Amino acid sequence: LITTVLDITWEVGRTGKLTPLAHLEPVDFMGVTVKRATLNNYDDILRKRVGIGSRVLIRRSNDVIPEILKSVDDGEPANPVTIPTCCPACGARVERDGVHIFCTNSLSCTPQIVGRLEHFASRDAMDIEGFSEKTALLLVNEIGISKIPDLYELTPASFSGLPGFGEKRIGNIPVSYTHLRAHE
């Protein structure tokens, strides 16, 4: 299936790795509207000759994840993508390590902090029920959580007044955070 790349942005993960994300002209593919696809890394962009405005061949890897296979345009892209010189989230400098690009600001780059908190609270780690990326972002932005040990200081009162935390949800917190403290 062929579509057009409208933009390419860079997302920051919990390890600080920047991953290029292609925003596509929406296209119906196997019953799903595909609007975005990963490009893995900068070398992948170059190898596939993808730029903004490129017409690209896409597929759904394992019938799930949208993937750009290649540009169907002749020659190099008219609007090539450049390597970012700073983190799109926090503005810190970036470093290249092989094919990957990393934000150097691991202490205060919000997407990295949110990603680490979410990973720590996930089912495969501490299994804190109801803790999501949205919750982590709220804790970082509203309470100032910046590292995993800060989670151990939270009490139900910490959540009072936060958007999405009514009495019922706050009442469920002790169960989850008692579980967290049990792993100390």
Summary of predicted features, one role per range:
Residues 1-37, 42:
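Long, charge-dense accessory insertions within large macromolecular proteins
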Residues 57-66:
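Short, charged beta-turn/beta-strand-edge "cap" motif at the junction between a beta-strand
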Residues 69-125:
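Cys/His-rich short segments
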Residues 178-184:
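Conserved small/polar residues in nucleotide/adenosyl-binding loops
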